[in-house]
């Protein structure tokens, strides 16, 4: 069957390195599209053995320590990983693919990333992560009057280790409670491990400061639920996804890992979507 997504031409191969060695990185490494070769990984000091065991490749703490220069650096480690290696890679002309979209809520860091990419003649690519419909938002943003609200709903345990613990007793909840309302920029900055989706929605559509975000702890939620409500001159739409975790890893989004694999596959396609 003919597929829009295509694949890498036979004989062509792109070399990638990963930032991180957690569940998302391990899933990506285990399911690479044809034509994509994993040649190394970057990890924090002291994590070399764990990274080698998880990924089975050469490991370093800095890009220049890898035995082969990658064509693409894939960030699977979160904001800290992008901050540690993004600027260096982009400045050296290595393209970066990241799921840490919330890191761009820091306007200074975002500008530094853009400057580094321009200086290196490359680009920073943002994976869609745990959400969809970003293509529709991007199209709607070309019109007028766009208004967007993102709602993130998770079971209480999904908010552990976040700012929500400071305002809620997560173990005592008997019904849904909204613990954050504000801009997508503020959400991404206050919840760096939980609000990458809010930032992705905002950057695709109305922008970080014009997109409204609501974060909810809901003991009745069986999955992480992401919802986009948008309206403007184009019309209106509502999109919802109930995201499941990677098998055996309840805190890692399956769709986030799959979005990286999809981005890798699309890079090699002669015919592919424009989004």
Curated annotation (Swiss-Prot):
SUPFAM superfamilies noted in UniProt: Glyceraldehyde-3-phosphate dehydrogenase-like, C-terminal domain (SSF55347), NAD(P)-binding Rossmann-fold domains (SSF51735)
InterPro entries per record: Asp/hSer_DH_NAD-bd, Asp_DH, Asp_DH_prok, L-Asp_DH, NAD(P)-bd_dom_sf
Binding residues for NAD(+): 130, 196
EC code(s) of this entry: 1.4.1.21
Highest taxon of the lineage: Bacteria
UniProt keyword list: NAD, NADP, Oxidoreductase, Pyridine nucleotide biosynthesis
Substrates-to-products reaction catalysed: L-aspartate + NADP(+) + H2O = oxaloacetate + NH4(+) + NADPH + H(+); L-aspartate + NAD(+) + H2O = oxaloacetate + NH4(+) + NADH + H(+)
UniProt cross-references to Pfam families, sorted A to Z: Asp_DH_C (PF01958), NAD_binding_3 (PF03447)
Active site: 226
The protein's annotated pathway: Cofactor biosynthesis; NAD(+) biosynthesis; iminoaspartate from L-aspartate (dehydrogenase route): step 1/1
GO terms of molecular function: aspartate dehydrogenase activity; NAD binding; NADP binding; oxidoreductase activity, acting on the CH-NH2 group of donors, NAD or NADP as acceptor
EC class name: oxidoreductase
GO biological-process terms attached to the record: NAD biosynthetic process
Task performed by this protein: Specifically catalyzes the NAD or NADP-dependent dehydrogenation of L-aspartate to iminoaspartate.
PANTHER family registered for this protein in UniProt: ASPARTATE DEHYDROGENASE DOMAIN-CONTAINING PROTEIN (PTHR31873:SF6), L-ASPARTATE DEHYDROGENASE-RELATED (PTHR31873)
NCBIfam families documented for this protein: PRK13303.1-2, PRK13303.1-3
HAMAP family assigned to the protein according to its UniProt record, in alphabetical order: NadX
Miscellaneous comment: The iminoaspartate product is unstable in aqueous solution and can decompose to oxaloacetate and ammonia.
Family listed: Belongs to the L-aspartate dehydrogenase family.
Protein name: L-aspartate dehydrogenase
Gene that produces this protein: nadX
